[in-house]
Amino acid sequence: IDTLQTHKDSVSCKECGTSTKIDSYGNFLPDFKFRTVEEWDSWQDEFYAEYYKSCDSETILFSDENVCVNTVTSEHETKNVGSGKICMYKEKFVFEGEEKTIEFDLSQISDMSIYGRKTLVFTDGTGAHYEVKSEKLINVRKYLTIYNLKKEV
């Protein structure tokens, strides 16, 4: 989780070294643990659900550094909140900026989604819109997955 890298038709894990290739139909080679991206995705969802259940509310589930957080107005104007680190817990999403820390209670986030390949967007309980961006490619899907798991509880 969060350690995959791709190059052309190859997919590999930076952590354990597992690798495979994708054929012209979008399937993995037959000797791989998963046959399709959908199978791998289902496994990942199960992993996240078990991981979520196994952690307490003070455990950082995930974090990413060197992100930029902006607010987006109803006129689509972007205002920089700051740069820093984001952390996902079971009950909250935290931005640890260079100048300030902002905590968002997950139950007060009314909507969260992914924009593009590396931008997480969400709306808080006051109706303020935020976007979390990174210059490098980060796995923003993990944050959305935990948010959705929290909504199900």
Residue ranges of each PLM-predicted region?
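Short, surface-exposed charged micro-motifs
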Residues: T3, S83-K85, D111
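Short acidic/polar mixed-charge low-complexity motifs
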Residues: T18, G84, E98-K100, T126-H129
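Short hydrophobic/aromatic-rich beta-strand segments that constitute the beta-sheet cores
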Residues: F93-E96, V121-F122
